[in-house]
Amino acid sequence: WGEKALADCRAHKVTEELTEVILGIIVSTGLVSNFVQVDYTTGLAHAVYNGFTGLKSTEENHHLHGEVVSYGILVLLTIDKQYEEREKVFNFNRSMGLPTKLSDIHATPDDVRTVAEKALKGIDVRKYPYEVTEDMIVDAIMELEKYNAEH
């Protein structure tokens, strides 16, 4: 339903597909948010989103939470070296018009260190299977930039 739901949303049309996607997001997020401790309701993709909220250019261009989190998923998969999964998400993002590179969210390589610093200031990766560092985030974002240039 995702592709049609997004197209319907952009066309300001309420359809069964859009309704089902919205309900799925609200129900799953609501359940997770209420059944687990706060440290487990977020992760690295959200940390990356939070990092980008510190950029004036990202805020001024009104990028949606889910758009930037979808980019954060690419960063997460790059850090974890899950390249096959990254390729699937990358192709999905491209097909849906979701961000795959910095310029898609009005950011530049000069912004990356600031994003990484802010990403680590919240609770998002406070309890994580491994320590996440600024350099890991910076390196993953720059690797994604290279991947975009090659694809």
Outline where the language-model segments fall.
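C-terminal charged capping/lid subdomain of soluble metabolic enzymes
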Residues: 82-151
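Active-site segments that bind and position negatively charged phosphate/pyrophosphate groups
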Residues: 1-92
